[in-house]
Swiss-Prot record:
Ranges that cross the membrane: 564-584, 637-657, 821-841
Binding site for L-glutamate: P518, T520, R525, A691, T692, E739
UniProt keyword annotation of Zinc present: no
GO molecular function: adenylate cyclase inhibiting G protein-coupled glutamate receptor activity; glutamate-gated calcium ion channel activity; glutamate-gated receptor activity; kainate selective glutamate receptor activity; ligand-gated monoatomic ion channel activity involved in regulation of presynaptic membrane potential
Main subcellular location: membrane
GO biological process, one term: G protein-coupled glutamate receptor signaling pathway
The protein, known as: Glutamate receptor ionotropic, kainate 3
One annotated Gene Ontology cellular component of this protein: dendritic spine
Residues making up the signal peptide according to the UniProt record: 1-31
Sites carrying sugar chains: N70, N76, N278, N381, N415, N426, N433, N548, N551, N752
Residue intervals annotated with topology Cytoplasmic: 585-636, 842-919
Phosphoserine PTM positions: S869
Record localization: Cell membrane; Postsynaptic cell membrane
């Protein structure tokens, strides 16, 4: 809501309030008394300041004077007051003073503030039915029978709920609650019960009793790394705590303090504005209202003119919450009395126990009142008289001072403004012009000493990927830094006692602000420190020396073809030979005269016996020949397809054999983590107290558990750093388990090392910050910006690309499998099917001619021929008898041509001739 609108609303409110008051006042102005008396009982302490008027007493007078000057509220009536002072915790004196004021005829009693005195005065007011106005927190029992009081201080249950909502918004996973006295445990019940309902761990501590020295407690919390602390104490104690925390070095950006006092705005926080500390509190004073600002300004002017106070840590002239509550209380009583003008006030005596007859009526007017005062909206619970509906401003310390960052109300809960969401507590400007301590560890190529002919100092001593990353972050966020090497040279691991070492410990102890190194993000480290988003993703792999060449075995000539191919070739050989044998017996064109010079022979023979068929296939496979030549078309198809098949197989075998003979086969004894776990000959390990070691130590996978058992059983398996592990991998039979990025860098520069297998896991490198550091989010945003601009990839290429090892070719020849030459088997099968079809055609055609010539039935001829062909042992058979023949030279020549004599046989001289004889 804008300021002009608030001012207009205030003016309208004052106008209607005046009309409302006049409406009550005008009809019965004659019945209004000329004087209304109220009573105030205030405590004072012994010592030199005993007579100094406190803020509540001043506010009591200030409020009455404002009402008397503003005749709109009580036009014909003067508000007078009676002030009594008592010692702290003197309930007897408080009772006596209350009775004295009741005898004067007061319409209400204000105060006192302390518990025992308040209870004493409240019991008297309850007995005589006179309203008692309370201004401090007070524990009220559940079975509350005291009806004659109202309390303007916000209800403690609602305040505790506001603190819990703020803690949840800040996403605190742990916090420390520090209370001043036992009443603090009652006030913070809602928060203390939070661990049973929310995921938050609370530690409860108490401030020293009867002492303002909180340094021992602060020291203990600092040593315990308790950075999120909720203080339930008075504003006076809060000022002392802040001053002592500054002396203890706890006013830094890593700490976040929440104070439950509603007077945090009144403290002098000038010394802490630029400390970076996260300081959050609550405020009920409605300073956004112009009317309230005007009243507060008048108050400040009067306070500055009063005698100076000895109390330190407060701003001069500031209106405290108690004073604002008392101001509102006096106005509420005055307005309510104005609404009940027919009431009369008599002198009341405590010893008579005679109640004020208008007390109940007046008390109801007060409980039903609704007022917009200095502390905002004032509404009372009609049963308990407590203030349960109010608005709390959430205030936070910035470099410009305290700023309102949100509002909380019982109805709407916590509402953080957009400005606060964008800025947060000291985050936006927290890195600008700040000098940060950066811890790191030497690790190539992330952080290395720069090689130079001259002596280097400071940050110039270092170079590497992380150094370039740090420069880019500093350029984007505008901070300076100092690089320091971690003392023990370790990344950070937790021992059995829960103690950390390495860079993680330096972040926990706040010796460093950032850890910029190849620091792996793990859930164990996340419990101790905060991480940015990863700037590099990687995984664990195996570094091992390259294997030496192996001597070929005696049967290495079988390597060019895979075992499957050898088996299929053998089956093809057997199949083709058998099919050739069967088709040769069925095809009539494979039966011919055993002696071409004797065409009159009654028998024919077939050279493709079972053994000859196998011999023909073997000769073709060996590309040597067998002197067996198929004559029929079907058998020639088989022969041609088989020759084509052997051509492809032999050519492929010869080509791949040359590759196997010329390439030195490189075989590694291990190919994966499973191979490592199954053997004990090769020793393996990781860097001690590193993330890789922690991964195997915490893993629940059986293979990795077995590997960790091996590493933990041998002290020599774990190395101090990567350099030692790399050296062992080169000189001994040792495998180093390390991050893949480092392996990639090492193998680029050492050609004798290689990565074995793939990644065992997946993780990332992040920048570490202390728990609760406000720098983390800004660094994460900067890393994402570098990633989008591809600068992270450019930096990696710069530091990882080596000039040593050339790109390795895949020198290992692979055996030919069915995927590469399987087609030739399909062609062979198709050829066999075709030859069978042709053989069937030949068989049917020839037998039909024979049946006609012999004047037999076709079926009987086929049956006889099949019966003979199935007799596999016989290689000769009787020739079908033609008709009577006569010897003529023409017939002899024709017969010789049709019988297709073997090559060389045609030149043989024959002395006989046949001539057909026709009957």
């Amino acid at each position: 809501m804008t300021a002009p609108w608030r001012r207009l609303r205030s003016l309208v409110w004052e106008y209607w309030a005046g009309l409302l008051v006049c409406a009550f006042w005008i009809p019965d102005s004659r019945g209004m008394p000329h004087v209304i008396r109220i009573g105030g009982i205030f405590e004072y302490a012994d010592g030199p300041n005993a007579q100094v008027m406190n803020a509540e007493e001043h506010a009591f007078r200030f409020s009455a004077n404002i009402i008397n000057r503003n005749r709109t509220l009580l036009p014909n009536t003067t508000l007078t007051y009676d002030i009594q002072r008592i010692h702290f915790h003197d309930s007897f004196e408080a009772t006596k003073k209350a009775c004295d004021q009741l005898a004067l005829g007061v319409v209400a009693i204000f105060g006192p503030s302390q518990g025992s005195c308040t209870n004493a005065v409240q019991s008297i007011c309850n007995a005589l039915e006179v309203p008692h106005i309370q201004l401090r927190w007070k524990h009220h029992p559940l079975d509350n029978k005291d009806t004659f009081y109202v309390n303007l201080y916000p209800d403690y249950a609602s305040l505790s709920h506001a603190i819990l909502d703020l803690v949840q918004y800040l996403k605190w996973r742990s916090a420390t609650v520090v209370y001043d006295d036992s009443t603090g445990l009652i006030r913070l019940q809602e928060l203390i019960m939070a661990p049973s309902r929310y995921n938050i761990r609370l530690k409860i501590r108490q401030l020293p009793v009867d002492s303002d020295d909180s340094r021992p407690l602060l020291k203990e919390m600092k040593r315990g790394r308790e950075f999120r602390i909720i203080f339930d104490c008075s504003h006076t104690m809060a000022a002392q705590i802040l001053k002592q925390a500054m002396a203890m070095g706890m006013m830094t950006e890593y700490y976040h303090f929440i104070f439950t006092t509603l007077d945090l705005y009144a403290l002098d926080l000038e010394p802490y504005r630029y400390s970076g500390v996260n300081l959050t509190g609550f405020r009920i004073l409605n300073v956004d209202n112009p009317h309230v600002s005007a009243i507060v300004e008048k108050w400040s002017m009067e306070r500055l003119q009063a005698a100076p106070r000895a109390e330190s840590g407060l701003l001069d002239g500031v209106m405290m919450t108690d004073a604002a509550l008392l101001y509102d209380a006096v106005h509420i009583v005055s307005v309510c009395y104005q609404r009940a003008p027919q009431m009369t006030v008599n002198s009341l005596q405590c010893h008579r126990h005679k109640a004020w007859r208008f007390g109940g009526r007046f008390m109801n007017f007060i409980k039903e009142a609704q007022w917009e005062g200095l502390t905002g909206r004032i509404v009372f619970n009609k049963t308990s008289g407590l203030r349960t509906d109010f608005d709390l401003d959430i205030i936070s310390l910035k470099e410009d001072g305290l700023e309102k960052v949100g509002v909380w109300s019982p109805a709407d809960g916590l509402n953080i403004t957009e400005v606060a969401k964008g800025r947060g507590p000291n985050v936006t400007d927290s890195l600008t012009n700040r000098s940060l301590i950066v811890t790191t560890v030497l690790e190539e190529p992330f952080v290395m000493f720069r090689k130079s002919d001259r002596t280097l100092y400071g940050n110039d001593r270092f170079e590497g990927y992380c150094i370039d990353l740090l420069k880019e972050l500093a350029h984007i966020l505008g901070f300076s830094y100092e690089i320091r090497l971690v003392e023990d040279g370790k990344y950070g691991a937790q021992d059995d006692k829960g103690q950390w070492n390495g860079m993680v410990k330096e972040l926990i102890d706040h010796k460093a602000d950032l850890a910029v190194a190849p620091l792996t993000i793990t859930h164990v480290r996340e419990k101790a420190i905060d991480f940015s988003k990863p700037f590099m993703t990687l995984g664990v792999s195996i570094l091992y020396r390259k294997p030496n060449g192996t001597n070929p075995s005696v049967f290495s000539f079988l390597n060019p073809l895979s075992p499957d191919i050898w088996m299929y070739v053998l089956l093809a050989y057997l199949g083709v030979s058998c099919v050739l044998f069967v088709i040769a017996r069925f095809s009539p064109y494979e039966w011919y005269d055993a002696h071409p010079c004797n065409p009159g022979s009654e028998v024919v023979e077939n050279n493709f016996t079972l053994l000859n068929s196998f011999w023909f296939g073997m000769g073709s496979l060996m590309q040597q020949g067998s002197e067996l030549m198929p004559k029929a078309l079907s058998t020639r198809i088989i022969g041609g397809i088989w020759w084509f098949f052997t051509l492809i197989i032999i050519s492929s075998y010869t080509a791949n054999l040359a590759a196997f003979l010329t390439v030195e086969r490189m075989e590694s004894p291990i190919d994966s983590a499973d191979d490592l776990a199954k053997q004990t000959k090769i020793e393996y390990g990781a860097v001690k107290d590193g993330a890789t070691m922690t991964f195997f130590k915490k893993s629940k996978i059986s293979t990795f558990e077995k590997m960790w058992a091996f590493m933990s059983s041998k002290p020599s398996a774990l190395v101090k750093n990567n350099e030692e592990g790399i050296q062992r991998a080169l000189t001994a039979d040792y495998a180093l388990l390390m991050e893949s990025t480092t392996i990639e860098y090492v193998t680029q520069r050492n050609c004798n090392l290689t990565q074995i297998g793939g990644l065992i896991d997946s993780k990332g490198y992040g920048i570490g910050t202390p728990m609760g550091s406000p720098y983390r989010d800004k660094i994460t945003i900067a890393i994402l910006q570098l990633q989008e601009e591809d600068k992270l990839h450019i930096m990696k290429e710069k530091w990882w690309r080596g000039s040593g090892c050339p790109e390795e070719e895949n020198k290992e020849a692979s055996a030919l499998g069915i995927q590469k030459i399987g087609g030739i088997f399909i062609v062979l099968a198709a050829g066999l099917v075709l030859s069978v079809l042709v053989a069937v055609g030949e068989f049917v055609y020839k037998l039909r001619k024979t049946a006609e010539r012999e004047q037999r039935s076709f079926c009987s001829t086929v049956a006889d021929e099949i019966r003979f062909s199935l007799t596999c042992q016989r290689r000769v058979k009787h020739k079908p008898q033609p008709p009577m023949m006569v010897k003529t030279d023409a017939v002899i020549n024709m017969h010789t041509f049709n019988d297709r004599r073997l090559p060389g046989k045609d030149s043989m001289a024959c002395s006989t001739s046949l001539a057909p004889v026709f009957p």
